[in-house]
Amino acid sequence: IVYFLAMSEFKIRNLNYHILFLLPGILMGLVYAKVHHVFFFLFSFYVLFNLYMNFSFDKRKLIKQIKIIIYIHVIVFMAQYIAFYTSGYVLLDYREAFGMRPLRIWNHTIDFFRAAGLYEEPNSYAVSLYMLSILYYILHRKIDYILVAACVTIFLSESLWGFGAVVIILGVVLIDKGVKLTYITLSFLSIIALLILDSELHFLFSPTTYRRFSIILTDGSFIARYGIDYQGTSMLSLFFGHGIGADGYFKSFGGNGYSAVIYYFGLVGALGFCLVFYRAAGNFIYFMAILFILSTTPMIFYFMFWIWLALIYRYNYLDKREAAKKKYFLSST
């Protein structure tokens, strides 16, 4: 009801884009999919995406709101980080009292602590700050202290995925500012090699994190998330998927977002999603930033992912297109 009321007030932009959005589900629905799962998934996220894309937000207010949210995340994270390393006290360890799963930030057995702020684990913190930072930069187009603070806390969380997230954020900013990709790649590779090989810089990481870096390909967490086992997967299922509602994607392709997309929608459906993401991004570097978020948990099943994607599309692609139209109109007149 909310959706159709909203659409009666706001003009739907780019009808061909919305039709393209339906492509993965249409193709996936031809094979094992359960009809009600397909309908719920497509309708829910299609509605949510349209609502956020078509509503007219005040850009300045949105930037301010995102900045405040990042502020809160950074302050709470640093308070937890400093509290532990100065007193040994784990701040915000309240989850068990409310019947929730305990924080997964301190391994008592090996005395390994990683701050996560308001989140259950460092990876969740890194994912949230990554999404906020990318959106903040796209809206603001400036490098300021709040963006730097976000990257620093992601780095301090010692999430292996978070290290990659910092690289992607810096890459997006530098490429957008006109720095050549070759220079950026060589610089990042040099820094990473220095951090891993130079024993004098190991103080930046805990011994556990450094050990995970040095044996990354045999790390249990890495294998569980990115290990691939094609056994039991037919060619038909590989191309068209098992359908939403099927179990076991993490057993076949690993527990990450790419695995979920391929397992549920197949390679054909995954291509459809890539077209959607590229259209929303508007350029290759933002497209890579969107794809990177799927290298962790299956974000396509989270509402916040589609809100994030819709806002990127709304303020990046559509604003550029409208600006180009105005420029053309002024030049022609």
What does each model-identified segment do?
Residues 140-144, 167, 171, 180-185, ...:
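Hydrophobic transmembrane alpha-helices and their immediate junctions
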Residues 67-90, 107-111, 117-158, 164-173:
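Alpha-helical transmembrane segments of multi-pass inner-membrane proteins
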Residues 25-40, 257, 285-323:
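Membrane helix-loop boundary segments at the extracytoplasmic
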Residues 6-7, 28-82, 173-174, 273-279:
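Transmembrane alpha-helical segments and their membrane-water interfaces
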